[in-house]
């Protein structure tokens, strides 16, 4: 069968952009813990020796931004000046202001069910059946590689590893869409000065790549690129500045689905960039899990200050078992996609976001938008 290739990448929790995402979501969680109705838009910038936390917040809560920031950086593993970034000595600037009352006017309502969207925008949710978590394989295994890198770094299996790392996996697909195998694997990891290139390659292959990637998809044709530049000592915020919201494809579907452009981290659930993207994933996953399609991409859009979505559309890439018009009707009947409705449906007004900020927001069963609790109702209503 003819084959085509598809590639996705991921980055570790120590990547500068992911440091920023985790700080933003740690601040959000701390505020939501005290004030579930808070309005939060928290942005973070990190560079050598400095973290700047800014944005707009309206809340009755008080949180210690400096302590939250230092704790987050420490948990990631930047704890010594030898790494170029130290949780205990970096400067922290707090430039958070209040949310515009013009936005509040459009969002808040006497009847919370009529809460308007916090902004206009379009969001996508996607699912397919090529993995047991209904996610594309390239992004799933890219995440697993850098997650494994973090584990063997923290448990000292490979004590010379440092926090910054990137992965990339290229899958080969048959013409019918089934997986033929893995064509290429890239893993670049920051390391200490004292490890040789040979030991690094062996350690990464034996302790990271082989335990993660299924042997059935590997062959003698599979290509491996482990630290292909030969040296990756300078990394983290010293190597590159980091910014919240700059890894939106890593956070979602690795490029296999479209993206509306809005980032997630640092945003409370009134921001449909985040909450509606989670709800769209919930819808798409339940449609695929119910057997109504093998692949499903749902688009939803909003106008600022308006509760009802301005559009809902579905693309199943020719894999639907029922008419797409029926799928849209099922979505409208079984899922409340108004901002208040989806926040209630998925119980989003609580501190659950920091753990989303590294290794992907989707395909992880601990999150409420990954539940498949609508499967039976969808099948029954579709007549299956």
Swiss-Prot record:
Binds 2 divalent ions per subunit. Binds 1 potassium ion per subunit. ATP binds at residues 15, 164-166, 231-232, 240, 246-247, 263, 267. InterPro entries: ADOMET_SYNTHASE_CS, S-AdoMet_synt_C, S-AdoMet_synt_central, S-AdoMet_synt_N, S-AdoMet_synthetase, S-AdoMet_synthetase_sfam. The keyword Cytoplasm applies. Residues 99-109 are annotated as: Flexible loop. It catalyses: L-methionine + ATP + H2O = S-adenosyl-L-methionine + phosphate + diphosphate. Mg(2+) binds at residue 17. It is found in: Cytoplasm. GO terms for biological process: one-carbon metabolic process; S-adenosylmethionine biosynthetic process. K(+) binds at residue 43. Its EC number is 2.5.1.6. It is an enzyme of class 2 (transferase). It comes from the Bacteria. Pfam families: S-AdoMet_synt_C, S-AdoMet_synt_M, S-AdoMet_synt_N. Its cofactor is Mg(2+); K(+). Homotetramer; dimer of dimers. Catalyzes the formation of S-adenosylmethionine (AdoMet) from methionine and ATP. The overall synthetic reaction is composed of two sequential steps, AdoMet formation and the subsequent tripolyphosphate hydrolysis which occurs prior to release of AdoMet from the enzyme. Belongs to the AdoMet synthase family. NCBIfam families: metK. This is S-adenosylmethionine synthase. The gene is metK.
């Amino acid at each position: 069968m003819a084959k085509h290739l598809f590639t996705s990448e991921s980055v570790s929790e120590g990547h500068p952009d992911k440091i920023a995402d985790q700080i933003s979501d740690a601040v959000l969680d701390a505020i939501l813990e005290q004030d579930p109705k808070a309005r939060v838009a928290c942005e973070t910038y990190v560079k050598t020796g400095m973290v700047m936390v800014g944005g707009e917040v309206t809340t009755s809560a008080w949180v210690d931004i400096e302590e939250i920031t230092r704790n987050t950086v420490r948990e990631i593993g930047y704890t010594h000046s030898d790494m170029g970034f130290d949780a205990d000595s970096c400067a922290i600037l707090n430039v958070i202001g209040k949310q515009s009352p013009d936005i509040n006017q459009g969002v808040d309502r006497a009847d919370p069910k009529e809460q308007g969207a916090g902004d206009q925008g379009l969001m996508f949710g996607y699912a397919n059946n090529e993995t047991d978590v209904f996610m594309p394989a390239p992004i799933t295994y890219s995440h697993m590689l850098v997650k494994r890198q973090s584990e063997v770094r923290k448990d000292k299996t490979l004590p010379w590893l440092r926090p910054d790392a990137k992965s990339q996996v290229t899958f080969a697909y048959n013409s019918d869409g089934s997986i033929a195998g893995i064509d290429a694997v890239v893993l670049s990891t920051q390391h200490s000065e004292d490890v040789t290139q040979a030991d690094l390659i062996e350690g990464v292959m034996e302790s990271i790549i082989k335990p993660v990637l299924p042997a059935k998809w590997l062959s003698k044709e599979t290509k491996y690129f482990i630290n292909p530049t030969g040296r990756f000592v300078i990394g983290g915020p010293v190597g590159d500045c980091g910014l919240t919201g700059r890894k939106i494809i890593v956070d979602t579907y690795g490029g296999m689905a479209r993206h509306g452009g809005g980032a997630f981290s640092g945003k409370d659930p009134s921001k449909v960039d985040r909450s509606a993207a989670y709800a769209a994933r919930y819808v798409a996953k339940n449609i695929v899990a119910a057997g109504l399609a093998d692949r499903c991409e749902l688009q939803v859009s909003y106008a600022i200050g308006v509760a009802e979505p301005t559009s809902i559309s579905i693309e199943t890439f020719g894999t639907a078992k029922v008419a797409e018009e029926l799928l849209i009707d099922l979505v409208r009947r079984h899922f409340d996609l108004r901002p208040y409705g989806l926040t209630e449906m998925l119980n989003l007004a609580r501190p659950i976001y920091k753990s989303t900020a590294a290794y992907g927001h989707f395909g992880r069963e601990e999150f409420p938008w990954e539940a498949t609790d609508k499967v039976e109702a969808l099948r029954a209503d579709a007549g299956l």
